[in-house]
């Protein structure tokens, strides 16, 4: 037990063994009696420090340890290694069951009924006046645990019962440890280790890696005990409680349940050193029993005493969506054991199920080779990852995926459901192909050893555990990137910092691919599995680094805080240096990717984004070049009604004045309207058709009347001149930078080119305040374009140049959003319905920002 100036308490959020160091804590019994605990010592010092007084049971424990060592030596000498292994394996199983089953049952009853405490009270074991044999023995036993001048009668029964319980725990734990270590020692290939310990070969690497794991395990145990002291080490809160504030520290900041998780990494280190798969299987058995003890003994007690995790108490976003939204059900999630949330009324769930069945049946019938299946798995992973990353990136920047469904008449919830289906389907296909690939390698190729396969399965188990913890913490909403699609549903703009996220900010980057690397071990370091694991890890890292992290900053306004692992690491100088190095490499990588790989803005992109001025200035220089080529300068092609900004608003009529020498004029001359980016660099010949956007300059031409928009025509002794108009019947209805070209006779030879100008839709963004105003503005615009009938319908046949795409672009220009042409057709081009839908989409997208 820790001293009164440095006590410990379990974390009251349901997380087991999250103990903390605190300044002052006064224990209290179940009867609320508060007391200052005496000083206690850890197990090793209590047993082996000769300066400390020993109790009778402690002497017995020491004797049993020595006896087991002697037994091991003589059994090995006279009975052989195999028989000795059986003896100590049997002992280990007995003591391990005594620990996990025996102590587990005792603690279970103590937790629920205070059985040990009540037994002590009922039989007056610690009563000063009690004189029965059991009472005298108990008092004699624990009196050795008190310092001189202190008395057991000063403390409540709960404390004394706990001290006595510790003695039996020490016996079981020390025998459990001793018999396991002796079993491992007997299993060691001593000659192989001694001959290869200084060599850089598989055996030498394996041995040194195992040694490092054992040393790490020792550090975990020492650090854990320095944090939790004896109180939590010996399950003190099953007997009495302590009041204190919580401050996480040490190894409990690095990993959940460290005494049960990484606290057993030494088992696997010893398995590596021995190279014996029997030792590995025994270690796994012991570790699994420990996890069962954690699950069925400690966790229920912690939740009962301190309450469950706070995240479980709060209603998740998914539960709120199910309750508040019509036609929404929780998404299908493919797990290691099958499907979660399967809905027999959702067709997409059946698609996923049929896809899995088709892949398995197809592989059974076609029986592809391992290489073929590996190529399919690798290609599928690359394609699906690129699709997922593209959707998430565009969704984060422009709500592209949601807009796509909104434009086609669906709502944002349906869009999110479709993303859930796509993401889960991709994950399911990738994992089922990986499982089949491993199976085919196991059947058709050389499989690895028992050790590599077992360690591979352990890595797979780590990934399953990691995914389970992540899902438990962030639920379906976080699992399916809900904050990319429905950030408006987030009540608290605060990043998760509980569960596994207390220890690691992005656990999926490390443990989320552990099982993928486990397949490398299972498939005996196959090159194809190395490629798969590398690809999987790279896409995982890229997604977190360049998509998730920037989006979290955008939505939550802050980056994730330092994880427990990072805080613990930076306490040490080497940790600070290592983190500094990682940060520098990370920054260099960012600089390289964003300066070398991100393409610079092109002219076409500038055109799309509205950066018109630089393009127009460039084209004015080209215009002067054409004039110089004409030589005389007696050529003129001017736009009459252009403003100072070189802009004309659709559908204004455009008047053009022209003049050429009589020698250059031909009655079949004509003027065409072209988009600058489509005409290319050739300023002497137009190599693209005008698509009907042209007019003759003379009424005596051989052209049809539809293309004779002549306002004026005349000539004198030197020049022929006139003016024409481009009205809505031949005008372009697409925004962009345009120019007029005067062509000679019935050819595409350019005589002169007008000044470039911008053709834009009217701007109403600032003036449109509500949906009714938007409807009125849209109808007015369509009426000016001559495509509105019955005061409410858009008629596609009124103007072949004003299409559904044009109307879509109008809404995009006016409201920064639009609907699809398919949706327009479904409404029979009803302007009221279409405009109301556009307004609704705008409100939804604004709400998602």
From Swiss-Prot:
Residues 77-85, 189-199, 253-264, 372-375, 439-451, 531-849 are cytoplasmic. It is found in: Endoplasmic reticulum membrane. The gene is CHO2. The chain crosses the membrane at residues 56-76, 86-106, 168-188, 200-220, 232-252, 265-285, 351-371, 376-393, 418-438, 452-472, 510-530. Its main location: endoplasmic reticulum. Its EC number is 2.1.1.17. It is an enzyme of class 2 (transferase). Residues 1-55, 107-167, 221-231, 286-350, 394-417, 473-509 are lumenal. GO terms for molecular function: phosphatidylethanolamine N-methyltransferase activity. It holds the Pfam family PEMT. Keywords: Endoplasmic reticulum, Lipid biosynthesis, Lipid metabolism, Membrane, Methyltransferase, Phospholipid biosynthesis, Phospholipid metabolism, S-adenosyl-L-methionine, Transferase, Transmembrane, Transmembrane helix. One of its GO terms (cellular component) is endoplasmic reticulum membrane. It comes from Kluyveromyces lactis (strain ATCC 8585 / CBS 2359 / DSM 70799 / NBRC 1267 / NRRL Y-1140 / WM37) (Yeast). The keyword Hydrolase does not apply. Belongs to the class VI-like SAM-binding methyltransferase superfamily. CHO2 family. Catalyzes the first step of the methylation pathway of phosphatidylcholine biosynthesis, the SAM-dependent methylation of phosphatidylethanolamine (PE) to phosphatidylmonomethylethanolamine (PMME). This is Phosphatidylethanolamine N-methyltransferase. GO terms for biological process: methylation; phosphatidylcholine biosynthetic process.
